[in-house]
Amino acid sequence: MNTFEMNRRQTLLTAGMGVLSLGMLGMVMGRDKLDKRGKAVAAEKSCIFVLLCGGPSHLDTWDMKPYAPEEIRGPYRPISTKVPGMRINEMHTQLAQLTDHFTLINSMTHPGSISNHFDAMHHLLSGQSVKRVQQGVPDDQPYLGSFITKYRPSTRNIVSNAWLIKCVGPPVFCAPNIGIGGYLGSAYAPVFVGSAQNHPAMANFTPPPIYDLGDEKLLAKRRTLLSDIESNVLSKDAIGKDWSDLREKAYDAMTRPEGREAFDLDHESEQTRDRYGRHPLGQNLLLARRMVEAGVRYVTVNGWTGQAPHDTKGPPSSSWDMHGGNMGMGNAFGNGSYGMGFCLPRLDQALSGLLSDLKERGMMDNTLVVVTGEFGRTPNVLTQQPPGRQHWPKCFSSILAGAGIGGGQVYGKSNKHGAYVTSDPIRPEELAATIYHALDIPLNDPQNNSGISRPITTGKPVMELFG
């Protein structure tokens, strides 16, 4: 092809990009490649990843040590659950009746000496316990949602990978590379939905602008004009035809109602919205359910429970970094925004609402739910006032449910003070491999027409977690 023809094509492609948003084009790119391979996805599975940004205390939630000294066990009591022998925090009254729906892992661990949010988040979300590249560098390891978008893009008119409310950042808590897609590229990065000032528990919540058509008549005219130009210039060129097909799919995705409706909680009954809880975490989990129901493959939900009513300055968009007084966050066992008395009942309501709703709608078989922080908390309660706990990567707890995960079991153990794993450790690598396996993502298979030449994880799925 001569230089003139190349420049002419580039000009037309640039013009076409102006008609449709880059986010919308990225939404359909993976689906376009899937169609060309001619391979059908056996089951359209999705994942809701509830990220408890900051790292909750495992000792005060799901791995309680009631016989340990008070300075270790903390002030809360465990309660019995539907599963004999499984005991959880007394404020998890609704989850206690749903323990047959999920598996509780009490042996999560980070190898090495991680102690900060950035590295722990990066290892957890990338599924690799390797040193991260400098923040924002595109050659770094992609996160789970990016790989899932690459291998199993949505086949419907909606995004494949979404993140509901960024954790506080930068530089606090926020995973360093959530917005770039790592070495896969920005087309596989998540679409960000909402913020601390714009979330679905608010009456005026505004969804992302990827479905904003602007002047629809003008858009239609531009589409017609571009089609006329392409028919004369690009129709004889294979790449040009591919572009035309991709543009039409993007236009279709923008103009059909399914994508927009997924973000509209007005379609839900008042009873359902109340069931999840009228707070950021509850309404975001309801939004996540609507999104996977509409075809989104991977939704990360920031586990922010909101700002306590009496707090004049609560957390911007995180809840679980409960240091107590040594960082000015208030009593970790109190009722403030960084207090378990405020956060745990809201987590109980929102998560039990999600699990029950998925079960009733017949969505559990094809929806994986993961609930975890990036690490746990120190066995010893800090002695300064008000009390709290520091970061602890050696041992923490997670919940998995759906997509073949067995219910009613506790996997792994920690020692008598919850400081170290004593059996069946699960690193970020094993957790990632388990998630990929549950979603039918091929592990370490660079020949799968994906263009990926590096393994997506070095871990192996924990098959004992599956029912």
PLM ranges: what are they?
Residues 1-467:
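Ligand-binding pockets and gating/stacking loops
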